[in-house]
């Protein structure tokens, strides 16, 4: 960011109008910058978009970071910081290590931990909405199909034009940062409903009994463990064919969905109820038919070709009607069985993305992000913007969380446990069982 401030003008950019956006660990890095001491003194950016931020439960302190650095330097066979600074970048990348923000008493501002205590009064039990049932996020029931489809090579589909932004009803033209303190930058924040599919392979190794044992070990409290097990309908007797889906839901909420809501609530409180725009991304990915982690990036960058199934034409639909049926009762049923379906049974579990719904989500997402980068409010900040499913877009009442995210389960199971313990639950379950343990 310092480089941008020093050099972006030479490329036609404006160092006084920088917008950050990041997904996953990149989103978490943005939050760390927002909570940094330097951001209070000299902000290096002016607004940010945080998409499905993924945190580690505990940031390293100086001692643990020092031990980690010693191991890295030892593997590189360097003994001083001066020699370490001269190591080629390729060698550092080859180590595969990542070391992010450190709680050293310098980087973060005073009281930054309060962002992760979630002491906000929740608004989910508003009058008139007690009857709404909590639903499961779109797509987690179709994880078997998720494994079977690989992404094609990156590249723009020739059959699609560039993303010409459609003329959408624009929100009020108030500058998104005009009424805020400089270090309280305007913020767009949200998540995908099936972010936990990012860890689906290690999660698939869990058994029901192993999950129960691990939760008891993490929570160190029978009552708190029982709250989680009851909320997510997990027990030692959960059938093998169901345990993966339920752990995916728990990990999704613990690692991404609930932390996203905590951050949104705290940021809005700090900004006096203004300058924070919440969204939910429930649109199916164009290839896997599920709103998986980074599905929003595929629409935002528009650089993954659509599958052929997205370009079905009206004439193809008409071909299903060939006139009146004329089938003899004596004809063998097996003669028509091979023509009844062109797809595997698993494909019925996912939603195909057609060209229209893809373009609608893509254009709306790009338009809102660009409007925000230009200093406009992307939508009303007292509303939630929805992307999907099936091409749905628009502002919605915040009561939609009762149907699109498991907010009441968070209140029951997560809030008594606390942010760090919930993060630890999510991290440990997302890594799968240890080799030879928790598998029986």
Regions found by a protein language model. Give the residues of each.
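Gly/Ser-rich "nucleophile elbow"/oxyanion-hole loop immediately N-terminal to the catalytic nucleophile
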Residues: 5-21
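Substrate-access "cap/lid" subdomains that shape
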Residues: 6, 42, 47, 51-211, ...
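Loop/turn elements at helix/coil->beta-strand transitions in domains of secreted/extracellular proteins
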Residues: 14-18, 42-47, 183-186, 270-276
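C-terminal, loop-rich substrate-recognition/catalytic regions characterized by aromatic stacking residues
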Residues: 182-226, 366, 429-440
């Amino acid at each position: 960011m310092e480089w941008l401030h020093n050099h972006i003008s030479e490329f036609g950019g404006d160092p006084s109008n920088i917008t950050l956006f990041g997904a996953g660990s990149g989103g978490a890095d943005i939050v760390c910058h927002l909570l940094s001491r330097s951001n209070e003194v000299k902000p290096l950016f002016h607004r940010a978009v945080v998409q499905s931020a993924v945190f580690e439960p505990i940031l390293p302190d100086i001692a643990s970071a020092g031990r980690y650095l010693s191991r890295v330097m030892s593997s590189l066979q360097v003994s001083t910081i001066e020699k370490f600074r001269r190591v080629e970048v390729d060698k550092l990348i080859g180590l595969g290590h990542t070391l992010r923000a450190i709680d050293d008493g310098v980087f973060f501002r005073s009281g930054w931990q309060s962002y992760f205590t979630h002491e906000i009064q929740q608004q989910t039990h508003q009058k008139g909405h007690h009857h709404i049932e909590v639903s499961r996020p779109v797509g987690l029931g179709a994880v078997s199909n998720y494994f079977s489809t690989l992404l094609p090579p990156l590249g723009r589909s020739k059959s699609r034009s560039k993303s010409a932004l459609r003329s959408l009803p624009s929100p009020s033209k108030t500058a998104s940062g005009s009424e805020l303190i400089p270090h309280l930058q305007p913020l767009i924040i949200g998540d995908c409903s099936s972010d936990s599919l990012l860890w689906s392979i290690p999660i698939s190794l869990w058994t029901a009994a192993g999950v129960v044992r691990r939760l008891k070990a993490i929570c160190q409290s029978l009552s708190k463990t029982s709250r989680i097990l009851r909320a997510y309908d997990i027990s030692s007797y959960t059938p093998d064919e169901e345990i993966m889906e339920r752990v995916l839901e728990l990990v999704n909420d613990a690692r991404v969905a609930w932390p996203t809501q905590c951050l949104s609530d705290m940021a809005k409180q700090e900004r006096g109820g203004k300058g924070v725009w919440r969204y939910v991304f429930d649109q199916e990915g164009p290839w896997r038919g599920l709103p998986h982690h980074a599905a929003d990036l595929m629409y935002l960058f528009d650089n993954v070709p659509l599958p052929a199934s997205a370009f079905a034409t009206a004439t193809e639909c008409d071909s299903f009607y060939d006139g009146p049926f004329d089938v003899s009762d004596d004809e063998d049923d097996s003669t028509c069985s091979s023509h009844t379906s062109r797809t595997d049974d698993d494909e019925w579990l996912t939603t195909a993305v057609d060209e229209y719904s893809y373009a609608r989500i893509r254009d709306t997402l790009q338009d809102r992000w660009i409007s925000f980068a230009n200093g406009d409010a992307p939508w009303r900040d007292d509303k939630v913007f929805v992307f999907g499913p099936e091409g749905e877009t628009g502002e919605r009442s915040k009561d939609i969380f009762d149907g699109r995210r498991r907010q009441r389960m968070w209140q029951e199971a997560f809030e008594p446990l606390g942010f760090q313990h919930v993060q630890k639950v999510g991290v440990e379950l997302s890594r799968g069982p240890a080799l030879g343990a928790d598998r029986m």
